Amino acid sequence: MAAFSKYLTARNSSLAGAAFLLFCLLHKRRRALGLHGKKSGKPPLQNNEKEGKKERAVVDKVFLSRLSQILKIMVPRTFCKETGYLILIAVMLVSRTYCDVWMIQNGTLIESGIIGRSSKDFKRYLFNFIAAMPLISLVNNFLKYGLNELKLCFRVRLTRYLYEEYLQAFTYYKMGNLDNRIANPDQLLTQDVEKFCNSVVDLYSNLSKPFLDIVLYIFKLTSAIGAQGPASMMAYLLVSGLFLTRLRRPIGKMTIMEQKYEGEYRFVNSRLITNSEEIAFYNGNKREKQTIHSVFRKLVEHLHNFIFFRFSMGFIDSIIAKYIATVVGYLVVSRPFLDLAHPRHLHSTHSELLEDYYQSGRMLLRMSQALGRIVLAGREMTRLAGFTARITELMQVLKDLNHGKYERTMVSQQDKGIEGAQASPLIPGAGEIINADNIIKFDHVPLATPNGDILIQDLSFEVRSGANVLICGPNGCGKSSLFRVLGELWPLFGGHLTKPERGKLFYVPQRPYMTLGTLRDQVIYPDGKEDQKKKGISDQVLKGYLDNVQLGHILEREGGWDSVQDWMDVLSGGEKQRMAMARLFYHKPQFAILDECTSAVSVDVEDYIYSHCRKVGITLFTVSHRKSLWKHHEYYLHMDGRGNYEFKKITEDTVEFGS
């Protein structure tokens, strides 16, 4: 024991502690990278990210290329508001650097006055410091102002660009229903964009200021202590920077995983809010609590690993970028003073040596701190690489979807019970859509889901304006799929589809969508008030649409057309369905798809609505199980759910089924 204790010096203990922490770091890093691939026995909530195509999140040429691509969006022109803020920040950074140099020189002179007991010098330089305080404070706060404004400008530019792509045509629908590369786009469009913009601006500031400091201090120090000192510091920067960059590589990937788990956690919470009524009826709070806790547990486990990794990296960063850098600084600045034969200080007095040492030492200290900040900025750059990878992936997916390309796991034809095993493979977009008025015609169209699950192998029928069609069949037979193909939400896998343009085809769902806005907005959606004026439709005509669905009283009840309410809560189920029919009368399409949209409406009101649709020339495709609606239709399309269908004219001999 005595032989062992003699090695337990403070120095050896510190080295052992550092080695132990480094070992823990490497072990924890290995665990963190493989943790969620092995530990979780449950599949992820939304496995939308392909395992074979993981996004790179390291600082390399790919990262710089991606960052450059996004910067062109955020700074679109040479002369723009963002450029002005970039110049303002650059000017303020230069001014702040010169303020720092002046503060060092003036502070040294104040201390020289105190040590030399010169009341006159002390008062003069102290007065200079007091006089400069407002200017220095103004520079610092102008810098903060420029940084905050630039963050906001970048966020506005990037958000507008992404939403322009996201809300183009049906891209927002395709991303969630046709493509499975992006999970939780709301997380990317809100939090990730904000964090990316903040990280870019902070990195610009955290790199520009230290570089300016280094250039200026090298110039000042070279004349004071020679070129060898600054060169030694730069060499140390290069070696330590390469070493720390290598250690920080997992940060980018861990950042991507953090945002992914945050998105999943946000998704399950919003899902609970959206479906709260159904969950309450099922008394499913315990099950939902298990789901939320399970997702939250994955997030917490990852954050624990990330926190420990950052702690370990912070320990190493502090030693290498701060303390060892300071030691190197002391070694460099002390050389001309400890060298008794150095020509610069051969004839210097004690006071001159002291003043020269303070000034050179503080400049070198500031330079070493600047070098340390550059080294530490690598950590933020690695984190930025994670956000950049996610934003770039979102941009690429949006671009693909807007060009009709999407990626989704396709169902194997051998897994199907339909005669599709011998059929040629389905290719999204292989069919042809022909726009023509007053006709809907399916010509040898395979009805299939986006992942290739065939519902009907070959669908063919034709409907002209004026001939209403009743669509019936069990759940999952393809009724909603038919409408999605008609609405061009789903791709056409083959054949020819003749139909009117999108604006001449209207869809009324069982649970109508009530937009945010006024009572008028509920009737004319998606039009606005200006669109209503352009169409020449007065408020009196709108009132007539409400009267047609027996909702005229709601105008007085809710306080007029410009009343703003939460209409999803204010209107009952039947009122919402009738409001959707009033919306249909406002738009007057050639064809309308009614998907169980009168299930909460009385039979007499329903009968009047269908009669009025025929009167105004709206041809209907109706999904309903009510026998009372057969009299309003000329044809029926029955799907049996096993890939078969029949399209026939309704006659007196037709057996009506339903309730």
Curated annotation (Swiss-Prot):
Keywords: Acetylation, ATP-binding, Glycoprotein, Hydrolase, Membrane, Nucleotide-binding, Peroxisome, Phosphoprotein, Translocase, Transmembrane, Transmembrane helix, Transport, Ubl conjugation. GO terms for biological process: bile acid and bile salt transport; bile acid biosynthetic process; fatty acid beta-oxidation; fatty acid biosynthetic process; lipid transport; long-chain fatty acid import into peroxisome; peroxisome organization; phytanic acid metabolic process. Its EC number is 3.1.2.-, 7.6.2.-. Residues 434-659 form the ABC transporter domain. The keyword Membrane applies. Glycans are attached at residues 12, 106, 206. It holds the Pfam family ABC_tran. The modification N6-acetyllysine is found at residues 61, 260, 399, 533. The keyword Zinc does not apply. Its main location: membrane. It is a multi-pass membrane protein. This is ATP-binding cassette sub-family D member 3. It comes from Rattus norvegicus.
